[in-house]
């Protein structure tokens, strides 16, 4: 169980919510995963996996392997902080992650974080357990 301490995943997850993370196992595009970055646990959404080509337009539209992603979980599209060269091919054994709050999230769009090693993933966020009025699965 983890307590969320940032706003990069709003509107899906909010500050001070408690979530349950299923240890390791498999994950796929669209899943929210927890991983270590600089001794801190971050939560982000898997956008692409090894070999995929990611492109992000100025308006924030995300394209993976030539197909525009349907992202109902994103409130407002934004390019956000991005200093990688696009289009970008995800390296072997890595995943490309982005926060749902695109204008403020620092994620794989930056060289600072980059793509996440699959082995750094702690697990998939599967359940919100607090606040009680929002208890349920996380998509």
Predicted regions and their residues:
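Soluble "head" domains of membrane/secretory-pathway proteins
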Residues: 11-139
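Short, small-residue-biased leader/transition segments that mark boundaries at the very start
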Residues: 2-3
């Amino acid at each position: 169980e983890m307590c969320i301490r940032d706003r990069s995943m709003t509107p899906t997850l909010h500050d001070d919510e408690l979530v349950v993370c299923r240890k390791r196992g498999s994950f796929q595009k669209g899943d929210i995963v927890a991983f270590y970055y600089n001794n801190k646990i971050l939560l982000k959404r898997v956008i692409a996996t090894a070999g995929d080509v990611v492109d992000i337009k100025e308006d924030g539209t995300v394209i993976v392997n030539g197909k525009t992603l349907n992202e109902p979980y994103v409130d407002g599209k934004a390019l956000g902080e991005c200093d990688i060269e696009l289009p970008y091919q995800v390296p072997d054994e890595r995943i490309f992650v982005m926060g749902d709050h695109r204008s403020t999230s620092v994620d794989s769009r930056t060289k600072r974080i980059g793509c996440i090693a699959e082995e750094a993933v702690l697990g998939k966020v599967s359940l919100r357990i607090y606040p009680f009025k929002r208890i349920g699965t996380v998509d």
